[in-house]
Structures are given as structure tokens and as C-alpha cells.
């Protein structure tokens, strides 16, 4: 079965073939469009269906041409886009391997319904495996880059023997970033898909993906730190240990995915589709811990010259002294070794998530009429994620006592220190769990119905989806501060009834012109972790949890021609009753607190334009532009509880967010990409992109009446607390060059891509701080907001790839 590909590989490496010189027309992608074909007269629906299902021109033109800054398309969070393989939700980490295995990727923006998924308001990305065998079933590729990793390789093979099909793929990346110290990637992903077709028309498939990765990450920092080091890519997450670079923030993942699908025809017009998927693995993220000691993070505000006020600190930062600007691992180890009882003062631990997700789906697809298709289905999903801390490195200490170190000096709660009351004063060694241990369990049931009608000119769709979601927490540690069921065992169950309704009506004026209107109304249950004030060690749920409501509408016009494709979309989305929780330090109360925000409302509206123009035989131009307004339209309510005893510090206080803009979402974008298809396999691309009207991510806490009234006592301080920072506009200029060589039916392609040719120092994103700086002035005390955290987009970088298809 595998003899043929082995022989091909031997031929490939045993010698080299002379490159052929096919006609230039073979490199011209528009020949198929201009070929004169006899018009079909049996079913005129075929002509209108092409314009009704045209691609997303704005996304195709802008995805790789806009500046590499934080971009939430249409102002929606990234997780609002649904990614599906059948009824299985797939993560971004599986996308490259699915493509290698031969899956076709279809993107449906905004509220546009997908082929097999009703979708929401944030778009849908569908992966589908086509029938048949690819013309060039084997791929081998290597690539080189100076960003995130140095070298990568991937290979894929597709084999077909009678009714059986087998696809194999792997993708590997390794090396450190040449531009940002401390950043590196070691990743390997393997994939396998086995499918079989039966004489009855039934189809069965089994997919298995295994991604394994370890990545050193970078952290945001303050503008002062970037200015002192004169390095926009300063990374405070690393330092030297025994002369070698060591990163404190390393992400490690092993998360395999298995999917089994079966499609059985029940009649000539009806098919039953059943799917079962499982995603189970471990995700780890390392961080430094410190106990009754100063923070080891070098860019903490207390270590910066603006706070210390001494010249020695400023000179050390200006000289880029790593003892000041980076983590001093050797000093942390020396401090631990001085401990009289061997207890750790500093340690490196992993925040671990052990994930197990199971999905069972069934769908019935029938066509009672050639123009009408009905979908009826059900999806049951059970998710269980267990979270805990695990000791990775004691940094020279012999152990760590598992107690709440922050309460040691507390006069009231200093005698309630145990993190795990059922195992008091437990000594933690390398590899042991400590601190917290709990699980979040979520059950989702969805029943869906969808009708799709296509006539000569009319395209209409209507769909409904009703669900039931149940969420609860289960604690495995009994914390002494919250004894019994307050922290240990199951919490109360929270129930939600999410729904989705969608309606689309489209009309084809001609086979080249199409207008559609889509309306969507839905609600979704909050994230599981957003339903608990402190899920690490507390079963207490937020008061009055509500699902988030979304209303959306969009109007799309498409026009296609021999030389021009045009797509114009006007959209409007309203998000209501959003919620979130987090832990923070409240400077006015001088306490660690649990923050809950409810009633978040956002209005997201604008227009998008995408165009593709064939300028001549060899030249093509792709254009994209958008103008929008993404703003908070309601003032959310903020509740603040003491993290120690759940005392209410703030209860449903108003946060003056109305009028603030959504962060990480440019409200003005434009891009242009010029492509030249040259003779003998040459092609080149030049693209320029712009992102403007960008804003920092606003802080909810510091806009509450309590903070503005106590800290904003002067017009200048009030403005500093409430005025949202607008970020500089971002520009980028990119170029790429490709050359393809043909060897019979095989082809070799080499490419060079250059990003950010101008080398602009572009801000990627900015996040306002919740913290306030306390400034004593005689008998009075003033407060001012801490500096915002920011990060920069990558500098000028390159990407080289060589791939061979045969």
C-alpha cells in the first residue's frame, strides 16, 4: 500500500531532474474564467448560486495586509468566531494540520450562515474534507524565519486504495526568536485521517491530531521601561541563570483531538450524520511565585526610576544592566539557599489545566424539494477542566509549605493559613500540586433546525437553535478561610437557556449582482470562570448571573465581473449583559479583591468594502477598507469583594464606561495588495496596510464613582482616570517573491516574505491598569493611575519557504 510513495521519495533524493519550461499561460490563474463555455439551459439556478456564495473579499484582501496589531474584526472578541469541523469545535492550534491533511477552509464573516453551521454574529470558519484524491498527493516543505522560531518542516501524504483513503501529516517548528530575547518555540504536530466509502453511499472517517508544543512567551510592560531600554521589544519575562537565558513564562501543551464521523443515506434525498469527538490533554503556563518577599519582576513600578527617584537606578536602566532590567535568577536562588528551614521564598510553578471535552452530535439532512434543504440536529457537549498549581522548580530550596503566605502577618486571619485543610502544613516538593485544586464542569445541549431555500434568484434561510447549559465548580482543596462546602466539593448549579435565531433573504438581480439581508438574535451563557468570584478556592457564585444577549444585522451587496469583484457590507451589532470576573488589588482599600462586572453593553456598527481587480493579463489588485464605531453604550455595574472574607467593598457601583471605545479594534482600516504573475513561474506581491482610530483597553474599576470621587479630586486627576488613550495609527509595508519550477507533474516552489519593511515601531495593544499610585503630600494623600501596560508589534522580519508537491 505504501510502496509507491517510497519509490517516489527514492527517486527524489537519488538524483535531480531538469527543470521544464512550460508555457507562461500555465502560471496565469484567470484562464479558466475567460474560457468560452456553452451556457447550460437546464437549471438557471447554477448561475445565481455562484454569486450567492461568493468569498469574503474584505477578509481575503486584508487578513495578511493589515498591520500586525490587535485586531478584533467588527469589534467582536476573537472567540466569537466559531471554528467547526462538522459539529466539532476546533481550536486554532489544529488549523495548520487540518489544512495539511487536505481539509478545505471556508470563512463566513459576521452573521452570514455557514454551509453546515447556523453561526452567531462573529463569523464562522468551516473545515470540510472533500471527496476524491488530490492531483498532487504528497508535500514536503521547509521554512526559515527570525520570528518565534528559526526553522520548520512539514510533510503530508494522501493515499487511496479502493474505498479506503488515508492522509498523514506532520508539522514541526523549533528555535528561538532572533528579534525578542526569551521567545522560542519547540512544537510538533502530527495528524492522521482514515476514511472509507461504502457501496450503499455511506461514508465513515476517523481523524486524530496530536499537537505538542513548548513556547517561551513575552510580556507587556510600561512605556517607561521601553523608553529606558530604548527597545520596543523589551521582554521582562526572562533573565540570566548561570550565564544562560531563562524565561519564566513558558507555555507547554499536549492536547490531542479525535473525531469520528459517519454519514448514512436513508433515502435518495435524506442523510443521517453522526459525530463523536474527544479533546483531552494538559496545558501548562509557568510563572514565578514569591512569598513574603519583594516581587522578582524587574519592571514593577517600585523598581523604576520614576518611583525610586535615585540616579543609580536610572543609570542602571539606561546602561541596560540585566541585574535591574531582567529577572536575576541567581539572586533568587541565593535568597532561597539562605533560608534557615529550607522553605522557599521564590519558586517557579505551573498553572495547569487538565482538559477533557466530549461532543456527540447527530444531524438529519433532507431535500423534500430540489430547491429546499432542511437540517435537524442535536449536539451534546460535556466539558471538564481541572485547574491546579504544580511545583516546577524550587530554585535551590528544599520544599515549600502549602499555606497562604499572604496571611502570615494578618492580625485577623493569620491563624487561618491552610490552603488544604485536610492536609495541613504539607511540604511541597518538585512536581507536587499545591495552592489550589478545582474543576469546572459544563454541560451543553443544543437542538437546531434550519431551512435553506434556493430558487433562480431567491436565496432564503431561516434557522433556530435552542439550548440548555449547566455550570458548576467542584473544589478538591478545603481552604481554611472558606471551610466546608464554601470551598470543598460541588458548588450550586447554574442553569442557562441560550438561543440563536437567524434569518437571511437574498436576491440575485443578475448572475453578477446580489443583495442580501441577514438578521440575528441570540444569547450565550457566560464563560464558566466568569460565574465565580474566586474560582481558585471559593464556591461563591456571582449575584444574578445572566446570559449575554446579541442582536445583529448586516446588508451585503456583491457585484462580480470578468475583471472586477466588489463586495460592500453594512453591519450593526448590539451586545448586552456582558460579564467578567477577575482578581485585583484595590489601592483605596489596600486589599486583594475579587472583581465582578455585569451589564456590559457595546454598540458595534460600520461598513466594510472589499474589491478584487484584474488590471491586465498579469497584474491583479486587491483592496479593502472599513470604517466603524465600536463603543460602550451602557455603564456596567461593579461589585468588589475582599478576597479574604468576602466582605463587600463595592456593591453594583456604576462604572462610567459609556462612550469609551472598544480596545484592540481599529475603527478605520485600509489595505492594498498588488500582485504580479510573471513568466516562468515568477510572482511577486506588494502590500500596504493602515489601521487607525485605535484605543487602549479601558479599565472598568478606575471609572467607578468611588474611585473618581476619592482619587479624581482635581480636573487633571479626574481626566487622567477617565480619559481613554488613543493609540497612534499603524502602517505596514510588506513584500513577497515566489518562483515555481515544474518537473513533469511535480512542482517546487520557493518563496521569500518580508514583513514591516519600513521597520516602524508600532504599538500592538495597550491595557489600562486598575492600580492607583498613592502619593503622600503632607497630611493629604493623592492618587494617580498607574502607567498602562503595552506591547509592540514585531519589527522587520523575514520568512523563507521551500515546498515540493508531487
Task: Give short role names for the model-derived ranges.
Residues 139-175, 179-218, 250-267, 502-504:
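Transmembrane beta-barrel wall of Gram-negative outer-membrane proteins
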Residues 54, 96-141, 152:
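A beta-strand signature from Gram-negative outer-membrane beta-barrel systems
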Residues 236-257, 261, 440-443, 490-504, ...:
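Outer-membrane beta-barrel signature, preferentially recognizing the C-terminal barrel domain
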Residues 221, 418-427, 470-483, 493, ...:
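Surface-exposed extracellular loop regions of Gram-negative outer-membrane beta-barrel proteins
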Residues 454, 570-574, 593-702, 801-805:
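Gram-negative outer-membrane beta-barrel transporters
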Residues 203-261, 284-349, 413-430, 583-584:
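Acidic/polar loop-and-plug regions of large Gram-negative outer-membrane beta-barrel proteins
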Residues 347, 373-510, 535:
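Signature of Gram-negative outer-membrane beta-barrel scaffolds
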Residues 20-22, 621, 690-708, 739-806:
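C-terminal beta-signal and adjacent terminal beta-strands/loops
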Amino acid at each position: 500500500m505504501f510502496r509507491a510513495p517510497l519509490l517516489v521519495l527514492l527517486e527524489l533524493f537519488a538524483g535531480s531532474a531538469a527543470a521544464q519550461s512550460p508555457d507562461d499561460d500555465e502560471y496565469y490563474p484567470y484562464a479558466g474564467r475567460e474560457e468560452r463555455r456553452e451556457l447550460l439551459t437546464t437549471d438557471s439556478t447554477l448561475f445565481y448560486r455562484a454569486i450567492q456564495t461568493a468569498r469574503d473579499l474584505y477578509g481575503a484582501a486584508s487578513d495578511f495586509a493589515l498591520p500586525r496589531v490587535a485586531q478584533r474584526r467588527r469589534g467582536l472578541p476573537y472567540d466569537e468566531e466559531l471554528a467547526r469541523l462538522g459539529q466539532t469545535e476546533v481550536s486554532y492550534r489544529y488549523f495548520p494540520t487540518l489544512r495539511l491533511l487536505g481539509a478545505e477552509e471556508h470563512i463566513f464573516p459576521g452573521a452570514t450562515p455557514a454551509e453546515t453551521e447556523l453561526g452567531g454574529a462573529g463569523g464562522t470558519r468551516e473545515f470540510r474534507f472533500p471527496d476524491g484524491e488530490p492531483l498532487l498527493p504528497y508535500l514536503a516543505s521547509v521554512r526559515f524565519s527570525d520570528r518565534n522560531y528559526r526553522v520548520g518542516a512539514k510533510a503530508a501524504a494522501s493515499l487511496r486504495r479502493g474505498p479506503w483513503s488515508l492522509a498523514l501529516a506532520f508539522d514541526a517548528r523549533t528555535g528561538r526568536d532572533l528579534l525578542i530575547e526569551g521567545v522560542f518555540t519547540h512544537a510538533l504536530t502530527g495528524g492522521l485521517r482514515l476514511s472509507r466509502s461504502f457501496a450503499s453511499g455511506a461514508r465513515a472517517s476517523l481523524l486524530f491530531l496530536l499537537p505538542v508544543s513548548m513556547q517561551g512567551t513575552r510580556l507587556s510592560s510600561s512605556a517607561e521601561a521601553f523608553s529606558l531600554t530604548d527597545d520596543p521589544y523589551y521582554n521582562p519575562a526572562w533573565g540570566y541563570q548561570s550565564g544562560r537565558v531563562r524565561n519564566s513564562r513558558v507555555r507547554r501543551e499536549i492536547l490531542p483531538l479525535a473525531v469520528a464521523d459517519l454519514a448514512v443515506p436513508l433515502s435518495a434525498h435524506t442523510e443521517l450524520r453522526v459525530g463523536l469527538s474527544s479533546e483531552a490533554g494538559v496545558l501548562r503556563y509557568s510563572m514565578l511565585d514569591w512569598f513574603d518577599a519583594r516581587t522578582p519582576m524587574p519592571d514593577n513600578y517600585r523598581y523604576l526610576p520614576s518611583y525610586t527617584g535615585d540616579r543609580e537606578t536610572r543609570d542602571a536602566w539606561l546602561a541596560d544592566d540585566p541585574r535591574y532590567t531582567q529577572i536575576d535568577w541567581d539572586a533568587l536562588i541565593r535568597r532561597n539557599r539562605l533560608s534557615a528551614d529550607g522553605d522557599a521564598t521564590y519558586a517557579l510553578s505551573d498553572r495547569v489545566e487538565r482538559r477533557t471535552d466530549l461532543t456527540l452530535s447527530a444531524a438529519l439532512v433532507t431535500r423534500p424539494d430540489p430547491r429546499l434543504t432542511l437540517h435537524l440536529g442535536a449536539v451534546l457537549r460535556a466539558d471538564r477542566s481541572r485547574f491546579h498549581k504544580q511545583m516546577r522548580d524550587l530554585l535551590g530550596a528544599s520544599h515549600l509549605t502549602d499555606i497562604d503566605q499572604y496571611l502570615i502577618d494578618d492580625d485577623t486571619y493569620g491563624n487561618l493559613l491552610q490552603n488544604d485543610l485536610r492536609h495541613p502544613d504539607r511540604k511541597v516538593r518538585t512536581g507536587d500540586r499545591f495552592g489550589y485544586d478545582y474543576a469546572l464542569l459544563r454541560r451543553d445541549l443544543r437542538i437546531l433546525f434550519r431551512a435553506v431555500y434556493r430558487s433562480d434568484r431567491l436565496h432564503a434561510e431561516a434557522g433556530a437553535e435552542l439550548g440548555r447549559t449547566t455550570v458548576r465548580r467542584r473544589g478538591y482543596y478545603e481552604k481554611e478561610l472558606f471551610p466546608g462546602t464554601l470551598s470543598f466539593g460541588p458548588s450550586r448549579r447554574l442553569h442557562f437557556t441560550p438561543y440563536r435565531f437567524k434569518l437571511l433573504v437574498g436576491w440575485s438581480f443578475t448572475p453578477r449582482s446580489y443583495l442580501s439581508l441577514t438578521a440575528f438574535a441570540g444569547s450565550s451563557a457566560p464563560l464558566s470562570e466568569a460565574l465565580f468570584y474566586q474560582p481558585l478556592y471559593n464556591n461563591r457564585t456571582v449575584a444574578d448571573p445572566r446570559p449575554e444577549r446579541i442582536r445583529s444585522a448586516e446588508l451585503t451587496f456583491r457585484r462580480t465581473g470578468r475583471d472586477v469583484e466588489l463586495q460592500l457590507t453594512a453591519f450593526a451589532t448590539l451586545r448586552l449583559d456582558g460579564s467578567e470576573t477577575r482578581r485585583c488589588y484595590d489601592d483605596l482599600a489596600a486589599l486583594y479583591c475579587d472583581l465582578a462586572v455585569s451589564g456590559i453593553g457595546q454598540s458595534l456598527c460600520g461598513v466594510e468594502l472589499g474589491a478584487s481587480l484584474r488590471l491586465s493579463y498579469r497584474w491583479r489588485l486587491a483592496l479593502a477598507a472599513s470604517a466603524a464605531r465600536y463603543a460602550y453604550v451602557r455603564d456596567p455595574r461593579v461589585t468588589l469583594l475582599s478576597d479574604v472574607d468576602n466582605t463587600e467593598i463595592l456593591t453594583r457601583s456604576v462604572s462610567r464606561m459609556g462612550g469609551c471605545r472598544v480596545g484592540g479594534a481599529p475603527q478605520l482600516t485600509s489595505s492594498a495588495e498588488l500582485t504580479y504573475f510573471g513568466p516562468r513561474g515568477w510572482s511577486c506581491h506588494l502590500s500596504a496596510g493602515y489601521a487607525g482610530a485605535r484605543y487602549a483597553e479601558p479599565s472598568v474599576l478606575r471609572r467607578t464613582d468611588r474611585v473618581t470621587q476619592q482619587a479624581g479630586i482635581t480636573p487633571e486627576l479626574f481626566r487622567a482616570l477617565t480619559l481613554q488613550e488613543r493609540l497612534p495609527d499603524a502602517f505596514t509595508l510588506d513584500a513577497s517573491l515566489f518562483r515555481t519550477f515544474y518537473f513533469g507533474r511535480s512542482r517546487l516552489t520557493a518563496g521569500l516574505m518580508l514583513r514591516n519593511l519600513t521597520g516602524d515601531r508600532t504599538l500592538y495593544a495597550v491595557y489600562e491598569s486598575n492600580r492607583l499610585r498613592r502619593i503622600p503630600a503632607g497630611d493629604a494623600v493623592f492618587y494617580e493611575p498607574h502607567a498602562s501596560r503595552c506591547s509592540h508589534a514585531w519589527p522587520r522580519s523575514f520568512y523563507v519557504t521551500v515546498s515540493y508537491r508531487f
